[in-house]
UniProtKB/Swiss-Prot annotation:
The lineage of its organism: Bacteria, Pseudomonadati, Pseudomonadota, Gammaproteobacteria, Enterobacterales. Keywords: Ribonucleoprotein, Ribosomal protein. PROSITE patterns: RIBOSOMAL_L36. This is Large ribosomal subunit protein bL36A. It comes from Pectobacterium atrosepticum (strain SCRI 1043 / ATCC BAA-672). HAMAP family: Ribosomal_bL36.
Amino acid sequence: MKVRASVKKLCRNCKIVKRNGVVRVICSAEPKHKQRQG
């Protein structure tokens, strides 16, 4: 899980999701692509 000021999709499998007011990126293909904004 990377914590970044701006989250971006890193591949075509990445999805941007907002959970409890926190923007996250989840990726089924590459777990290393998980990110959280903050």
